[in-house]
Amino acid sequence: MTLPTLTNLLIMTLSYILPILIAVAFLTLVERKILSYMQARKGPNIVGPFGLLQPVADGVKLFIKEPIRPSTSSPFLFIITPILALLLALTIWVPLPLPFPLADLNLGLLFLLAMSSLTVYSLLWSGWASNSKYALIGALRAVAQTISYEVTLAIILLSTIMLSGNYTLSTLAITQEPIYLIFSAWPLAMMWYISTLAETNRAPFDLTEGESELVSGFNVEYAAGPFAMFFLAEYANIMLMNTLTTVLFLNPSFLNLPPELFPIALATKTLLLSSSFLWIRASYPRFRYDQLMHLLWKNFLPLTLALCLWHTSMPISYAGLPPI
């Protein structure tokens, strides 16, 4: 590999990673501001104008602190897990069309599904390597929840593939030329949105960090830099899920918009969806664990399977009919 090629690769990678990290940093500020205004207070307003530099101050503070490792923990896994979590959270963005993906994969949706499944390992290893009963119980809860809700996410993705006829994310824009999929497949969109809340361990499904029983969940033993990495990974996953929701169900089209406006439309819709994540956090109490599992296995799974069957059978049944 020549030096110009390496330089080009580095520039491309940085140009796609840095905006994500900056967006994630400011998402934390948006969350604190929204929650504070909902609770009739000001929120962060000291660091910088209107508190805009608060994420920078928080990041610097966390990364210059001394990372503490429990003496009984597993050293290698304890250190490698937060790095793996952040690396996976950033890698998943590769096939997303913003408007052009970093790598236009033929099986982009399957890549997303496979990479999001790998995040389970970072949760499990962090809980196990901490050698703490609270961290382990929190990790087991998180893994059970993530694996469970991935089932419905996969089936809903399969249904959207049936509608678009392709595994690439770019074709979803062409599929949604006449109408957004959120209107034509609204039951799927509703279940997808609730499943993304559970998949990212957000309220009201944040059972992994039940403070009254688990202190803080799987990352209870982490501090300073490693904790910041987990935090960044969690919020990067929230941004990713909302971007994916926009691409799947609210995709702004190439034909209706100039390419320059595509990222603006995508970012606006993603921000609105992320804000509704935060609104839900401020509004709803936490679910009981059995309710969380019943919602998936007894309600969502039969419904998504039926809708997937419907989306599979309808094109076949219409195939023999003459055009209207």
Curated annotation (Swiss-Prot):
<feature type="transmembrane region" description="Helical">
    <location>
        <begin position="10"/>
        <end position="30"/>
    </location>
</feature>
<keyword id="KW-0813">Transport</keyword>
<feature type="transmembrane region" description="Helical">
    <location>
        <begin position="76"/>
        <end position="96"/>
    </location>
</feature>
<dbReference type="GO" id="GO:0005743">
    <property type="term" value="C:mitochondrial inner membrane"/>
</dbReference>
<keyword id="KW-0830">Ubiquinone</keyword>
<dbReference type="InterPro" id="IPR001694">
    <property type="entry name" value="NADH_UbQ_OxRdtase_su1/FPO"/>
</dbReference>
<feature type="transmembrane region" description="Helical">
    <location>
        <begin position="178"/>
        <end position="198"/>
    </location>
</feature>
<feature type="transmembrane region" description="Helical">
    <location>
        <begin position="300"/>
        <end position="320"/>
    </location>
</feature>
<feature type="transmembrane region" description="Helical">
    <location>
        <begin position="107"/>
        <end position="127"/>
    </location>
</feature>
<keyword id="KW-1133">Transmembrane helix</keyword>
<dbReference type="InterPro" id="IPR018086">
    <property type="entry name" value="NADH_UbQ_OxRdtase_su1_CS"/>
</dbReference>
<keyword id="KW-0496">Mitochondrion</keyword>
<dbReference type="GO" id="GO:0032981">
    <property type="term" value="P:mitochondrial respiratory chain complex I assembly"/>
</dbReference>
<dbReference type="GO" id="GO:0009060">
    <property type="term" value="P:aerobic respiration"/>
</dbReference>
<keyword id="KW-0472">Membrane</keyword>
<keyword id="KW-0679">Respiratory chain</keyword>
<keyword id="KW-0249">Electron transport</keyword>
<dbReference type="GO" id="GO:0008137">
    <property type="term" value="F:NADH dehydrogenase (ubiquinone) activity"/>
</dbReference>
<dbReference type="GO" id="GO:0006120">
    <property type="term" value="P:mitochondrial electron transport, NADH to ubiquinone"/>
</dbReference>
<dbReference type="Pfam" id="PF00146">
    <property type="entry name" value="NADHdh"/>
</dbReference>
<feature type="transmembrane region" description="Helical">
    <location>
        <begin position="154"/>
        <end position="174"/>
    </location>
</feature>
<keyword id="KW-0999">Mitochondrion inner membrane</keyword>
<comment type="function">
    <text>Core subunit of the mitochondrial membrane respiratory chain NADH dehydrogenase (Complex I) which catalyzes electron transfer from NADH through the respiratory chain, using ubiquinone as an electron acceptor. Essential for the catalytic activity and assembly of complex I.</text>
</comment>
<feature type="transmembrane region" description="Helical">
    <location>
        <begin position="230"/>
        <end position="250"/>
    </location>
</feature>
<protein>
    <recommendedName>
        <fullName>NADH-ubiquinone oxidoreductase chain 1</fullName>
        <ecNumber>7.1.1.2</ecNumber>
    </recommendedName>
</protein>
<keyword id="KW-1278">Translocase</keyword>
<dbReference type="GO" id="GO:0045271">
    <property type="term" value="C:respiratory chain complex I"/>
</dbReference>
<comment type="similarity">
    <text>Belongs to the complex I subunit 1 family.</text>
</comment>
<feature type="transmembrane region" description="Helical">
    <location>
        <begin position="260"/>
        <end position="280"/>
    </location>
</feature>
<keyword id="KW-0812">Transmembrane</keyword>
<comment type="subunit">
    <text>Core subunit of respiratory chain NADH dehydrogenase (Complex I) which is composed of 45 different subunits.</text>
</comment>
<keyword id="KW-0520">NAD</keyword>
